[in-house]
Regions:
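Conserved catalytic core of sirtuin-type NAD+-dependent deacylases
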Residues: 1-196
Length: 196
């Protein structure tokens, strides 16, 4: 079995070395090494706190002020954490530096690809980005730290400063449609490559 795995890795290395255009798909696994838990694994956020999934469901989030308050408090607990890109992110950066990386299609919302130095324009975050908050009504976007500071200052369910609408992280929740422009860009990156 080890021999087969080694042969497979050798073949992958040859493919990557020869490729002119590479698009990479990433998910939670690349960021767990940076200390960001996944959702469903043994130490996942929803495994440890099944009620947290309610905050990730659009109808519950929009319809229940207590769900929103709890979600904002959970985000505040993360404000001082400073996850850093890991070897996986840096390996992708090396592909970019060699001119091979055409795109990253990711389910991750942590922004670690960009923080590693990868060009933001080639990172297609299909589930959004946790570093922004967005008004559900008027689409106004603000840095997440600005919104979290309001929570820290005593506003348990901050509302949009422009229209009074409900604020949420700029991430995709269950029952929420993916952003068509992001999906289109992800498809283009997946089609315009030698290796996916």
């Amino acid at each position: 079995m080890l021999h087969d795995d080694t042969n497979n890795l050798d073949r992958v290395e040859v493919m990557i070395t020869a490729a002119g255009r590479i698009t990479v798909l990433t998910g939670a696994g690349i960021s767990t090494a940076s200390g960001i838990p996944d959702f469903r694994g043994p130490n996942g956020l929803w495994t440890k706190d099944p009620d947290a999934q309610r905050a990730a469901t659009l109808s519950h989030y929009l319809g229940d002020e207590e769900v929103r308050r709890r979600a904002w408090q959970n985000r505040v607990r993360w404000i001082d954490r400073d996850p850093q890109p890991n070897d996986g992110h840096r390996a992708l950066l090396r592909l970019q530096e060699r001119g091979q990386l055409r795109g990253i299609v990711t389910q991750n919302v942590d922004g670690l690809h960009q923080r590693a130095g990868i060009e933001p324009r080639i990172v297609h975050e299909v589930h959004g980005n946790i570093h922004r908050s967005r008004c559900w009504d008027c689409d106004d976007m603000r840095p997440m730290r600005e919104t979290l500071q309001r929570v820290i200052d005593g506003d348990p369910d901050p509302r949009c400063a422009l229209c009074g609408g409900i604020l949420k992280s700029d991430t995709i929740l269950f029952e929420q449609s993916l952003v068509p422009e992001v999906i289109d860009a992800a498809f283009r990156a997946s089609e315009d490559c030698d290796v996916l």
